[in-house]
Amino acid sequence: MRRTQFRPRAVSDTTARSRRAGRHTKQPADGTGSRKLRSRVLIAGAVIVVAVVAWVGVQLLRPVPPMTLAVSVTTMRVLPGPAPRPDWPGQAEAAVGLPGTGLLGTHGGSQPVPIASLAKIMTAYLVLSGHPLSAGASGPAITVTAADASAYASDQRQGQSVVRVTRGETLTERQALEAMLIPSGNNIASLLARWDAGTEGAFVAKMNARARSLGLRQTRYADASGADPATVSTAADQFRLTLLALQIPAFRQTVAMAQVTLPVAGLTYNVNAALGHDGITGVKTGSSSQAGGCLAFAAARTVAGSQVTIVGVMLGVRATATQPSELDGVISASENLLSSVGGDLEHVQVIRPGTVLGNVSSAWTAGSAAVAATGIAVTAWPGTPVTVTVTPRPLGRRAGPP
């Protein structure tokens, strides 16, 4: 059966209507009348297509309507088991905890006390913040000035902890940091302060400004080395600062070194006698008649196949009949504290895969369960409060091709 084509039929109908009306309109021989009609049909069709495409485009580009998440998972929980009982150091201030988890606890009050050479943690933190050292880099050269050589001689006469330097000697930034943090040269702290800020006073102003910006409200610096007893802080503040400093690879590597060879001073050793024992990887010792024994320490532990670092701070440990050296006393006290908490860490899964976290709803649906795609585990001590925060990513995106 033969199909009737649409286009010829349209022309025939027009001619038939003209005849019935008694007016026969002769079509031009060249077919222009047919072409005009076809053009009108095609234009109308094009308008419809354009309108449809435009409508679809608007729908595709329309923003996804807002969606809301109602959290139903318990947001606060306590890890099971009895909490550890830290062996705190008598009347001294102390703090211990983990990166990411925070403080396990503090002891001995929260009054600012002298911190001796723990001030050098902030000095190193500021220097490395302003003059970062990449892995293996030595950094810029620092020439020992006449003022630096004079400060060395003056500090030595006062019985301070010093590292020998001579006028005209050249130290790299890394060597200067090693000289300050490993044998704990007070004169090197002042040298670095002058190199960074022009004068030690200007550098101390930067130290105090940074302490305020970090929220170390009980911390005040009077010098770059901590020899001045007016340089004071708390164990909790120094714990927070130590966590930040340990995030800098150059700092972390330096405080873990047992010894270093310097251009003029030669081979020098780390003052921290506990370094390398029981997983201890740093951080900084300090002692003076006003400050007593002070120590910021870090110790590695392996829990469920993963390495974690216990961080602690002790301030104001005093000499005793059994520990006549304040420095030996604070190292011994830190070992006792570490032993009392180091074996109690646990790896606990607080959110399992598939856990219902809440309900997602929108204007066009009653809601769907939001579930955890993966689990969340923490390494902490039993009895530690854990806060679970559910933060949704943007629910949806602009429609259309990726």
Give short role names for the model-derived ranges:
Residues 5, 9, 57-64, 340-402:
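Conserved SxxK-family serine transpeptidase/carboxypeptidase catalytic domain
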Residues 252-345:
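A penicillin-recognizing enzyme superfamily signal
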Residues 93-102, 222, 227-255, 297-299, ...:
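Penicillin-binding protein/beta-lactamase superfamily catalytic region
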Residues 42-57:
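Hydrophobic membrane-insertion alpha-helices, especially the h-region
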Residues 1-41:
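Terminal targeting segments of Actinobacterial cell-envelope proteins
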Residues 2, 59-236, 243-249:
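Active-site-adjacent loops and short helices of periplasmic peptidoglycan-processing enzymes
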Residues 104-114, 159-162, 281-285, 294-295, ...:
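N-terminal post-signal-peptidase region of extra-cytosolic proteins
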Residues 146-157, 262-269, 360-367:
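Short, mixed-charge aromatic SLiMs
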